[in-house]
Design a protein with these regions (language model features):
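Ligand-binding loop in jelly-roll beta-barrel domains
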Residues: 80-102
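A short, N-terminal "cap"/entry segment at the start of jelly-roll beta-barrel domains
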Residues: 1-32
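Conserved short histidine dyad/triad with adjacent acidic residue
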Residues: 29-46, 80
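Short histidine-centered beta-strand/loop micro-motifs
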Residues: 20-22, 40-46, 63, 87-89
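Structural motif
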Residues: 58-60, 67, 83, 93
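Short, conserved beta-strand element in jelly-roll/cupin
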Residues: 35, 45-61
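Short acidic-glycine-tyrosine-enriched beta hairpin
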Residues: 65-80
């Protein structure tokens, strides 16, 4: 799993608008979601390529036997058909941008 971290020197200050623009420039459609504390997504897959991007909170992702905790500014590519799970970690909701490409 390769996490792309926000780089303020390259990307500027982190904001929802800036992260959305970065993903849209790559050809993704972007939707915003808020996941409450305790949210858990069991193993599943998608029929499209996507990127999970975190604006705030902490999001544990498990994929192909690996685990990573995404934090503000982190992006993780989830290829179509790859089984993964996710859960909110800690006591803060996760604000996420879900970027999809057909």
């Amino acid at each position: 799993m390769m996490v792309e971290r926000w780089d303020p020197d390259r990307d500027g200050p982190l904001s929802e608008a800036a992260l959305r623009r970065k993903l849209e420039r790559r050809g993704y459609r972007v939707s915003r979601y808020v996941y409450p504390v305790g949210t858990y997504f069991s193993d599943h897959s998608h029929d499209i390529d996507k990127i999970d991007a975190v604006l705030s909170g902490r999001f544990r992702m498990r994929m192909e036997g690996n685990e990573v905790i995404l934090e503000a500014g982190d992006c993780l590519a989830v290829p179509r058909g790859i089984v993964h799970s996710a859960e909110v970690v800690g006591m803060e909701p996760v604000v996420s941008l879900d970027a999809t490409k057909a």
